[in-house]
Amino acid sequence: MIKKLVLVFIAVFAIQCYAQEGTASPYSFYGIGSLKFKGTVENRSMGGLSIYTDSIHVNLRNPASYATKNIEGWEGSRPIKFSVGGSYSSANLKSTSSTDNTSSTTFDYLALSIPIGKFGFGFGMVPYTSVGYKLESLNSNDNILNRFKGEGGVNKTYLGLGYLITDGLSIGVDAHYNFGNIQNSTIEFAYDGDGVPLLYQSRETNRSDLSGLSLNIGLSYKTMLNEKLELVSGLTYTPESNLTSKNERAFSTITLNQDSGQEFIVNNIEADLSISGLKETELVMPSQYSFGVGIGEPKKWFVGAEYSGQKTSDFSNALYSSSTTTYEDASTISVGGFFIPKYNAFQGFFKKTVYRAGVRYEKTGLNINDQSINEFGISFGVGLPLGNGISSANLGFEVGKRGTTNNNLIQENFINFQISLSLADRWFQKQKFR
């Protein structure tokens, strides 16, 4: 039944989500797009906290989680773990002069973890960045001066290995292949003396096809402080890496359908970027690290805190450079936890439900018009038990804000809804009959 459910979920949900833009944030205009949260709905519902690892949930942030202790009462075995998730986001965009509403639906992750002895293997796919915006600048007569549009993003596929060094200490490494494309276009509008748009307008289009490799190293440690309390800690490190960007630029004369906004190319000229050295460029992906610690009672409750940082100040993108934009080091502080009323209850569905909550504060590393772009979010979630008791359907909710209206910028007030299936089972165990 679980296998059939997985197939239906992938076919219906993931395909539909890929047809949508992964973000509708105007801040995805900068760099290589808005950085996507790399983590499960379980993590996201605890303010992004990812240090907690166990034998029945996939952890996308720390590859050491692939090698965990056995489940008590399962005859010394660890299950295969599968997880797939997605989200819907709605945002109110506010400036000093206007407001607008946007929404987006996105596939967030597909992951599988397989234990073999003291080793554990993991592989899957997650979005890394996402671009999706449509912006307009106006003149004093409220006529459109420029229209900016962007789409695309960078995805990650990964293959990881974890090793259980001792009963509570594990180490792991992920190898990532990063790939994707980003397309940005700018239309410059011209008007006649009466303020009527001319028949022909000018458009510049830039496209980048990106690819590269990266690593993520993780360490996880758990130990019992006494008969009830358990200490949990973890750390990760992602070394600096490069993305190769193969670029194209074109200048077009277009006409516009005033009703639908559809663009029709009249004339198109491909720019020779090799002259300026922009035909193929290398983007430096900054190093990143995280560490955290928490305490709790196994299968009952947990609370923890985590800090992550990234040397975003090392990032640059020659093709999309802007004099008003700089990059500074990014960081995130997450605090959260979970509570389970009665994990082994024979009756009472909500007694076995996992209740999660958390809060996070993030410095995105983006500085526009001398204004740092920061983000704040409060999250809640539940894990609803399924079938064998170690699988669950997870629902998450987050409300928060990004950016500011200072210095002619935009503030986003957003609401995010997340859903996932977290499935665990011993697929290769032989059945016994009496």
Locations of regions flagged by a protein language model:
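Bacterial Sec-dependent N-terminal signal peptides
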Residues: 1-25, 434
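Subset of outer-membrane beta-barrel
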Residues: 21-434
